Amino acid sequence: LGMPSVKILLFMLEKGEVRYTDLADLFTSRGTLSLNLKDLEEEKLIQRRVVASKPIQAYYSLTEKGKEIAKRMNEIKKTLS
């Protein structure tokens, strides 16, 4: 996992379910964000929930596997701080 993915996982660990727009604030490039979200979803670390409203909203949250990994990363981050 690269730093952008780690940043996403730690953000979700802290905030819970988040909207795409919440995550977009973490990145200068939405392309980078979209690629990382797709990779994390394929690895089954996050799940996406789409609400068919106007405008359509996408929500992301950690899977159990994602929570486990994010918790470990958070411990490492605390150790290094």
How would you label these PLM feature ranges?
Residues R72-S81:
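Alpha-helical linker/hinge and terminal dimerization helices associated
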Residues M3, E42-L45, L62:
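N-terminal leader segment of winged-helix/HTH proteins
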Residues A24-I56:
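Canonical helix-turn-helix DNA-binding module
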Residues K54-M73:
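Basic, amphipathic "hinge/linker" alpha-helix immediately C-terminal to the N-terminal HTH DNA-binding motif
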